[in-house]
Amino acid sequence: MAEQEFRHMVRITRKDVDGNSTIATALTEIRGIGKAFAIAICKVLDLDQDAQIGYIDDESVKQIEAVLENPQEFGIPEWFLNRRNDYETGETKHLIESDLNMTLRDDLNRMKMIRSYKGKRHEVGLPVRGQRTKSTFRHGSSVGVSRTRPTGN
């Protein structure tokens, strides 16, 4: 990694990250990349995960973007990716930023459209995964305690 002048903002896949952050921490600012995936990217590209991302060169940024574009070509295992066996295409891929947001929104809309249990729960804003609802997930205003008015003394 050749040293060059420090950049306060580094643009990686349509996202500006803080140049003062370490490489692993800066990658986690991108939606769809967690700590473990960021460390895996650093290991695959032989980058120091504790180095500041403001000092890496443009070639390293392009390599990071290439890994994010197709992680399996660089040896990242299939179980590490966040979209396995896609509903429409059957592909296994890793989604980030707006692609991830659109896919999640489409998945929710599909569940609502086919009227599945999870889709119905999402529609009415109730918990989906079987949590209790007697005391939690309450919406609306609370009813306060009424006080008796003091009699005129």
UniProtKB/Swiss-Prot annotation:
Keyword Phosphoprotein: no
Tree of life domain: Archaea
Single biological process term from Gene Ontology: translation
GO terms for cellular component: cytosol; small ribosomal subunit
Pfam families hit by this protein: Ribosomal_S13
Feature: compositional bias, Polar residues: 143-153
InterPro entries according to UniProt: Rbsml_uS13_C, Ribosomal_uS13, Ribosomal_uS13-like_H2TH, Ribosomal_uS13_archaeal, Ribosomal_uS13_CS
Region described as Disordered: 129-153
GO MF term list: rRNA binding; structural constituent of ribosome
Record's keyword terms, sorted: Ribonucleoprotein, Ribosomal protein, RNA-binding, rRNA-binding
HAMAP family: Ribosomal_uS13
PANTHER family from the UniProt entry: 30S RIBOSOMAL PROTEIN S13/40S RIBOSOMAL PROTEIN S18, SMALL RIBOSOMAL SUBUNIT PROTEIN US13
Family to which this protein belongs: Belongs to the universal ribosomal protein uS13 family.
Functional note: Located at the top of the head of the 30S subunit, it contacts several helices of the 16S rRNA. In the 70S ribosome it contacts the 23S rRNA (bridge B1a) and protein L5 of the 50S subunit (bridge B1b), connecting the 2 subunits; these bridges are implicated in subunit movement.
Subunit-structure text: Part of the 30S ribosomal subunit. Forms a loose heterodimer with protein S19. Forms two bridges to the 50S subunit in the 70S ribosome.
Protein name (record): Small ribosomal subunit protein uS13
